[in-house]
Curated annotation (Swiss-Prot):
This is Sensory neuron membrane protein 1. The chain crosses the membrane at residues 12-32, 457-477. It is found in: Cell membrane. Disulfide bonds join C268-C333, C297-C352, C335-C341. Residues 497-525 are annotated as: Disordered. It is a multi-pass membrane protein. Keywords: Cell membrane, Disulfide bond, Glycoprotein, Membrane, Olfaction, Receptor, Sensory transduction, Transmembrane, Transmembrane helix. GO terms for cellular component: cytoplasm; plasma membrane. Plays an olfactory role that is not restricted to pheromone sensitivity. One of its GO terms (biological process) is sensory perception of smell. InterPro entries: CD36_fam. Residues 33-456 are extracellular.
Amino acid sequence: MLLPKELKYAAIAGGVAVFGLIFGWVLFPVILKGQLKKEMALSKKTDVRKMWEQIPFALEFKVYLFNYTNAEEVQKGAKPILKEIGPYHFDEWKEKVEIEDHEEDDTITYKRRDAFYFNPEMSAPGLTGEEIVVIPHIFMLGMALTVHRDKPAMLNMVGKAMNGIFDSPPDIFMRVKALDILFRGIIINCARTEFAPKATCTALKKEGVSGLVLEPNNQFRFSVFGTRNNTIDPHVITVKRGIKNVMDVGQVVAVDGKTEQTIWRDACNEYQGTDGTVFPPFLTENDRIQSFSTDLCRSFKPWYQKKTSYRGIKTNRYIANIGNFSEDPELHCFCPDPDKCPPKGLMDLAPCIKAPMYASMPHFLDSDPALLNNVKGLNPDINQHGIEIDFEPISGTPMVAKQRIQFNLQLLKTEKIDLFKDLSGDIVPLFWIDEGLALNKTFVNMLKHQLFIPKRVVGVLRWWMVSFGSLGADIGIVYHFRDHIMRLAVSGDTKVSKVTPEEDPEQKDISVIGPPAQEPAKINI
């Protein structure tokens, strides 16, 4: 049976509307999700893999040093007065090297190489890196703190060794150029032949102290970041590629072939989260993302804070902090001693970096108030000192990230070393870093073209198809049944009767209903 032309048009229009419903609300989300699963996996064919291997633009690496303006008084036990100097801005280039794929368990192994280049134009006005800063002698205090913790009976010998290695220093401070302590290095004189300095330097060489480089003639060169600069990190990291299950992408499963650490207790030794450079897609506000920091030997679990936007893309902001190890059951296993945890907001890094330092938020943000009261000159501000990451939730792409950490040291108080007998024993700040990522315009546009433009086009198209398809179907149906509709409109419940003249020969007035009209009665006045 052939359909009338109007019904054919109506059927076609209705089909368009139905297709718009099915494709726009059912098929397209499935197709988009499937495509994202392929694109976000660390397979060799994806753009994500290329960017994961080598970030094609520099990250911002900013360092803020704390200058001690009252060093002589601090040596006598006074509260330090600090002046923040910075930022010293470095362009940080990151890449992964010695990459190997393992098809059988869907993993990939790699090592890291970071390169830092000082950028005076982006640093604070007037800073060249040649400024002299006064800070606690990191190496000297580190030696004393390590021996005090591990072999306290040898503190007297370490005191004698310090006099030889550091030429009988007048106090526990160093006056040093900013770039020297950060990257270029300061000389540690281990050429002395006296027993105490020689024995101490031999132990240093054997232990492989972090930040220490052996120079000719039994000299050492020490810096905070110099050993990281343009060198391959020895640790081999294994992560999931996410090809079999995209929700596993980037998950750290082993470091140096070991599936867990041995430096903490219980669950804190587990590798939880991604390597911090890639995250799974389809994030919601209720999801707790996780990333593992090999530099701090721990996982962080940022939580959702609020809706944000970046270059026209809607994002979700997540924030994090160091935490409170004594009160948070998940973090209690980071306490080296179960019965004695660091104060709130402080993390003992000694088990991780083999140096007696503490990590905190900059300016002791979200920390025990006592830490802030131990010094003058700090002003914690969550906007300037907090950890925050803005994610595009559908793809899981970090659009903007600010990872901020402060490094602190204890002013060891001990009677066994003259230089240390009058110190306060408080934990004080040395410097803090702000490592920032912000996707440039090129990669934002790439994300828009791959994800948002198709999504918006389909969003408009599906409504157009449903609206105009429904309208076209209605018009076709109405047009086809127009004659029938008109007949129904005319007939309805109304009856039409034919009027014929009566056969009565008496003429009647058609305007009169009822009996024939009679002459009205006359009234006498």
